[in-house]
Amino acid sequence: IHKPISGVWEIRLSDVADTRTFDWEQAKKEEPVPPTGATLTVTAIAAEVSVMQQATADQGTGSATHDLWVTNRMGVFTGRLMSNPLGSARRQQLELAEKEQQIFEVEVPPGSPALMARVFGLSDSDADVDLYVFDCTSDECRPARTDADPKGDESVIIWNPSAGKWKIAVDAASLPSETVTYEYLDVVFNSSFGNVGVLDVPQERGQDSRWMAKAHVWSAGAGSHEPGRTPYPAVLLEGWEGSQSFPLSILELVSDRTPSRER
């Protein structure tokens, strides 16, 4: 769960192979399921990265080097920042009406390690807007991931998405007023757009600890992006458990706070 809201979460185990067939009404009942042997590991990690002011840029090549501060906001974990292909982002500020759905299409190039979608910055904090991602790379679109908690900050990351067409749906589940304004973001990461190289090593990161890393951003130029898309430099936060590594989150280096407006 990327960017979970604060509070209590409940985790349920089901013996179905396809979560689309999971009986959510049954899961809401108070009766416990029969005892079943299982092993469940849950890790809550929150880290943020900030770019220090002293960055050097090469205007001729579209590259820049940044010194980064990384802060661990939660419990102890072992991890590091990792290099990541440059992202190609679509940022928009949109208006959504009650019970309306807005659909966005994304073309994922071959070899993309991640596809990310996010809805945030709602004009009404009581509005409930949900996010759905569909894999349309085959003959029919299939549900891939959903973020549908009661709050309006929804985020989904698809690791190693199949190449081809994907669709993202933003759904106005419940709006106190007739409309709500929100910020929309989707990002495809691929080496054809450029690369963000990072120097860091896996270490134990204590609670509230900070560490430094250096990142070098290289961009293939504006011509590598489709119209309406811009470069999205970000690094990968990687966790370690024994000798096994796993992706935790994608952390943006530079935030663009001037999204385009659409009605």
Where is each model-derived feature located?
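Non-cytosolic beta-sheet module surface loops
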Residues: 3, 15, 108-110, 119-124, ...
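Short, solvent-exposed loop/turn segments enriched in Ser/Thr/Gly
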Residues: 7-9, 209-212, 220-234
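Long, low-complexity ectodomains and other extracytoplasmic segments of secretory-pathway proteins
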Residues: 21-79, 189-196, 240-263
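Surface-exposed binding patches on compact interaction domains or structured appendages
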Residues: 37, 77-81, 85-105, 124, ...
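Solvent-exposed, conformationally flexible loop/turn segments
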Residues: 45-74, 89, 97-99, 151, ...
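Acidic, Ser/Thr/Pro-rich low-complexity intrinsically disordered segments
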Residues: 94-140
